[in-house]
Amino acid sequence: MDYIVSVKGVSKSYGEVQALKDVCFEVKPGEIFGLIGPDGAGKTTLFRILTTLVLADEGKAEVCGQDVVKNYKEIRRQAGYMPGRFSLYQDLSVEENLTFFATLFNTTIRENYALVKDIYQQIEPFKHRRAGKLSGGMKQKLALSCALIHRPSILFLDEPTTGVDPVSRKEFWDMLLKLKQEGLTIIAATPYLNEMKCCDRIAFIREGKIQGIDTPDRILQQFSSILSPEGLSFNEPQVTGRYAIEVEGLTKQFGNFTAVD
């Protein structure tokens, strides 16, 4: 298999809003492929199409050699998906969540423990704690363990470290690099450019369009007027009405751009 993911001419609209516009790219087996772009760029929509949760309006996409529409059941068996928001069962314990996801794929924690051991051992002392009571970093490790418990061929991570402290972010990417060494293909979306340094290649997406695909350093050079190498990343404003609160002259904007007048 030359490419484990192939996307050709994919477009998707929600009403009058076009989330994706003629998106094309390919991912090689065993690489970490980064998808970087501001909020609203289309990253989550693209991930939902590739994980068979949303249908594209136009174009074709394949994952693990399978068409995302015709062979969605096979893709769901071969792919692991970690959404941007913590989506596990808050009222179940750590162990119960992992057991539940293993059962969905007709396997057990014991059968695949070796795969998640390095990650799960860090939260195993809290296996009886409810998931809703975990810290951000521990939730992240639990979600990754659940995404891996069925031994997927490819892992989709939608902004997995957003809202997590810097130490936990580094630990998380260290775990991903180790998974890559074991042959797992990883596609990760993030607004953090310093995380993209860990990727083999990245695609820069903005307003639903792929602007460029290359190594992290070359993308930074190509789009230096837009991207900032220091931290959270985008020099262009991306604030919409739902991210701003204005009360009697007091204005607070969330995300990359915070201002109080």
What are these regions (language model features)?
Residues 213-214:
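ABC ATPase "signature
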